[in-house]
């Protein structure tokens, strides 16, 4: 089996994936920006071959690297970066080289908050109202129909980056002034709960959950961003049956296969 890892060096705590794959007898190939000499010795020893590119952002350069490895080692069975930043690159390479896994079209349902909400609804999970924001008229409509307070985040984005909490008309005007009007936003009714729990785990290539667990967060992502706090969380010994029901329904609705999954809920 040929397993291609994109950016095997960074993040460093993910290097163990490559090391353990090699320990299982899998041929691990790597493409990254770092010089070969910079790779930690255990990682170097796990890679059958490492192809350095000048810029992982240059998809044509990366495709040429994949083509070379394909020619030298035979068909690539998997392409993974284990890094959210490179999801689109991973998907584009899989499509180009006909490799198992998520393709660009598949990412739409996990990268856009508006699309995720549609699937949450289909899975029977309670959600707060939301609206896609492309114009200032959309902003005014959301204020009228959803009502303040609301949370405003880029529709395509992760975490709490570029997030606005809208509680007053002044907050709305501030958002309009700061907004570049090209980034599509997603507004949602603000949830006052400070308790966040998660449904995390792994699915096999057929979409069956083979491991699941749950975390409780000490702080919300928004509080972490606003107050520059340190994050902490703990694993619960027992999972709330309602959380398991919702989590399993979401995983099934999204059609996840051979993936880690991480889903956050307000309690």
Where do the language-model regions lie?
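Short gly/pro/ser/thr-enriched loop/turn and capping motifs at secondary-structure boundaries
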Residues: 35-39, 108-111, 158-159, 219-220
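ATP-binding N-terminal substructure of ATP-dependent carboxylate-amine bond-forming enzymes
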Residues: 1-105, 137
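Hydrophobic residues in well-ordered beta-strands that form the structural core
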Residues: 30, 101-103, 129, 152, ...
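Active-site nucleotide/adenylate-binding loops and adjacent lid/helix of ATP-dependent enzymes
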Residues: 109-192, 205-208, 233-245, 249
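Phosphate- and divalent-cation-binding pockets in alpha/beta enzyme and binding domains
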Residues: 39, 88-89, 141, 174, ...
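Phosphate-binding core of ATP-grasp and ATP-grasp-like enzymes
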Residues: 179-184, 191-233, 241-267
């Amino acid at each position: 089996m040929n397993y291609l890892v994109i950016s095997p060096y960074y993040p460093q705590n993910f290097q163990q994936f490559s090391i353990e794959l090699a320990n299982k007898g899998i041929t691990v190939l790597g493409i990254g920006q770092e010089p070969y000499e910079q790779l930690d010795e255990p990682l170097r020893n796990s890679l059958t071959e490492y192809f350095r590119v000048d810029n992982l952002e240059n998809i044509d350069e990366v495709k040429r690297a994949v083509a070379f490895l394909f020619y030298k080692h035979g068909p690539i069975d998997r392409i993974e970066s284990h890094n959210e930043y490179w999801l689109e690159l991973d998907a584009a390479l899989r499509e180009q080289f006909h490799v198992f896994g998520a393709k660009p079209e598949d990412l739409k349902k996990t990268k856009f908050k508006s699309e995720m909400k549609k699937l949450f609804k289909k899975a029977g999970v309670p959600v707060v109202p939301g609206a896609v924001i492309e114009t200032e008229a959309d902003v005014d409509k959301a204020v009228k129909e959803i009502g303040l307070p609301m949370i405003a985040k880029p529709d395509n984005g992760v975490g709490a980056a570029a997030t606005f909490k809208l509680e007053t008309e002044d907050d709305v005007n501030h958002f309009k002034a700061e907004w570049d009007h090209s980034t599509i936003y997603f507004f949602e009714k603000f949830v006052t709960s400070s308790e966040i729990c998660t449904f995390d785990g792994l699915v096999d290539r057929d979409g069956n959950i083979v491991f699941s667990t749950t975390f409780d967060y000490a702080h919300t992502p928004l509080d972490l961003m606003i107050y520059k706090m340190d994050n902490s969380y703990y694993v619960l010994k027992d999972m709330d049956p309602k959380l398991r029901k919702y989590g399993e329904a979401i995983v099934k609705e999204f059609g996840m296969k051979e993936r880690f999954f991480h889903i956050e809920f307000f309690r």
